[in-house]
Amino acid sequence: MSFPGEIILELRGLTAGYGGVAAVRDLDLAVAPGEVVALLGPNGAGKTTTLLAACGLVPALAGSVHFAGQPRSRQVERNARAGLVLVPDNRGVFHSLSVRDNVRLAARGGAADEVLDLFPELRRLLGRRCGLLSGGEQQMLALAKAMLTGPRVLLIDEMSLGLAPIAVQRMLPTIRDLADRRGVGVVLVEQHIGLALSIADRALVLHHGRVALTGTAAQLRGDPRAIERAYFGLSA
């Protein structure tokens, strides 16, 4: 559920890329607390670059990023402490440590038990080394660790990468719940269009670094041909 009138993350005319070469061009995106926005598009469309530029890992070549009403810091760690948190596609867990130790490293105060209540499957795995977890379990742990930082916005990159569909289907409702019950804004990069649109409020389809299509999730679900045209850069 989104909250009209409030904006927690705003990208204004963002152009960003690598070595001075733009991978994203003139992108506008505003995210409200409690809103889930899906970024869709083929490989190389600029989805991950958008997330990395939003959190400060990739520099903006033009335009701006505002977080909580202020220009976003260039220091990634400062952004994370303020609540702008990236969940990368490599899952960001320490494979040589147990689930319990991963949670302890990320925990703030007594938040661990509260967050583990959101991921009850992890409680039975607390003593297991993370390298022995399935991909779905590692991704669940990555989300739990992100929640332990007290995020205001989660930037989730390719959550389903390499995971069985059943694992993805189990985690998506948790992301929706984080938005609805905790007011966390979410930007979700996802290749599975139907799954992304099942939890998103809005979606943008990127093609060659530009927004080719935008609308509510309901609008896009009702017009799959429009999504297909946007994916391949075809005119209406």
Describe the predicted segments one by one.
Residues R129-L133, E137:
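Conserved ABC ATPase signature
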Residues G63-S73, A82, G110-A112, D117, ...:
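Conserved ABC transporter NBD signature motif
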Residues Q169-R182:
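Helical segment within the ABC ATPase nucleotide-binding domain
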Residues C55:
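Helix-to-loop junction immediately C-terminal to a conserved catalytic motif
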Residues L40-P42:
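The feature captures the beta-strand-to-loop junction immediately N-terminal to the Walker
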Residues P59, Q70-R91, R124-G127, L220-I227:
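ABC ATPase NBD coupling module
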Residues A146-M147:
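ABC ATPase C-loop
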